């Protein structure tokens, strides 16, 4: 394993079968279930940065756990437990590393699409709208401004790219062709329901949920929410008290890092630059504030 138990860049657990190493998570095959470990790696523009962000994996896991509990009346999810003492026996030797940054989950047949929902005009959606008056092929009213709330949330699926590649927006019809019309409609409906419940709650906690992405799959034939949920890695979180239509506010997510990289002149290709200590620490603070605002607790709470 690279790093101490408090700073994890990569995991290596002899005796456990590594199934996949993603941008952030290492996934191990436990037979009829999976072990998902959130490392402290951070990526931007689909490239993994060379230095990690302390506590990031623990923060992401805490936030995902919170949302899975909160949303359990809207959709089933894949979580079995995040209590390492309940994990299969072969995981126990690695308890010190796994504690706080891992989840034991059901195996799912994951759909090959990212389920993106947008409630506000931001990021690539804003750029698309400026050029075409649409977002991912969905026509919107004329005259909208950056960061403006949309008349209603829109569902804009994308492909799931392999590591180092870029996701590509696809139409709902293309998604339906991939997973079936009825299933695609079900996924779209649940995605919107989850967003509406989560965004309403987040607003009460002083956060605007501008957009986010989910993954779904089938567990024993039932639609199931999988992977991370409503984290600063997968979502755009804005502080409500600093929100203004017409400009993109500071946020509790990766946008701070993206903005730094753009200013640095990096060309969004390998090799990425080493992040300065202040950028790492400020990124950590933003992630931690998202956890504290949303859940009411910090890492030790």
UniProtKB/Swiss-Prot annotation:
Keywords: ATP-binding, Ligase, Nucleotide-binding, Purine biosynthesis
Catalyzed reactions per annotation: 5-amino-1-(5-phospho-D-ribosyl)imidazole-4-carboxylate + L-aspartate + ATP = (2S)-2-[5-amino-1-(5-phospho-beta-D-ribosyl)imidazole-4-carboxamido]succinate + ADP + phosphate + 2 H(+)
Superkingdom field: Bacteria
GO biological process, one term: 'de novo' IMP biosynthetic process
Record has Nucleotide-binding as a keyword: yes
A cellular-component GO term for this protein: cytoplasm
Protein name: Phosphoribosylaminoimidazole-succinocarboxamide synthase
Organism: Syntrophobacter fumaroxidans (strain DSM 10017 / MPOB)
Gene this protein is translated from: purC
């Amino acid at each position: 394993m690279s790093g101490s138990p408090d700073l994890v860049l990569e995991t290596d657990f002899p005796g456990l079968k590594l199934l996949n190493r993603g941008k952030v998570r290492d996934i191990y095959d436990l037979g009829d279930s999976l072990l998902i470990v959130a490392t402290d790696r951070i990526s931007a523009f689909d490239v993994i940065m060379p230095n990690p962000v302390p506590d990031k994996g623990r923060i992401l896991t805490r936030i995902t756990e919170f949302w899975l509990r909160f949303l359990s009346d809207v959709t089933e999810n894949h979580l079995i437990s995040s209590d390492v003492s309940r994990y299969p026996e072969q995981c126990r030797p690695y308890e010190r590393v796994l504690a706080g940054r891992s989840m034991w989950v059901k195996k799912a047949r994951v759909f090959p699409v990212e389920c993106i929902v947008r409630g506000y005009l931001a990021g690539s959606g804003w750029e698309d709208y400026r050029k075409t008056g649409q977002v991912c092929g969905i026509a919107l009213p004329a005259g909208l401004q950056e960061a403006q709330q949309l008349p209603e949330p829109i569902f804009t699926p994308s492909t799931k790219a392999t590591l180092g590649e870029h996701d590509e927006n696809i139409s709902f019809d293309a998604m339906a062709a991939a997973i079936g019309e009825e299933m695609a409609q079900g996924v779209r409906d649940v995605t919107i329901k989850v967003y509406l419940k989560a965004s309403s709650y987040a607003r009460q906690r002083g956060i605007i949920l501008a957009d986010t992405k989910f993954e779904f799959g089938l567990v024993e034939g039932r639609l199931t929410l999988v992977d991370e949920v409503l984290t600063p890695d997968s979502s755009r979180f804005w502080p409500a008290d600093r929100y203004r239509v017409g400009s993109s506010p500071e946020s509790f997510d990766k946008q701070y890092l993206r903005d730094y990289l753009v200013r640095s002149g990096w060309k969004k290709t390998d090799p990425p630059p080493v992040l300065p200590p202040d950028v790492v620490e400020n990124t950590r603070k933003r992630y931690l504030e998202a956890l504290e605002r949303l859940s009411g607790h910090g890492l030790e709470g």
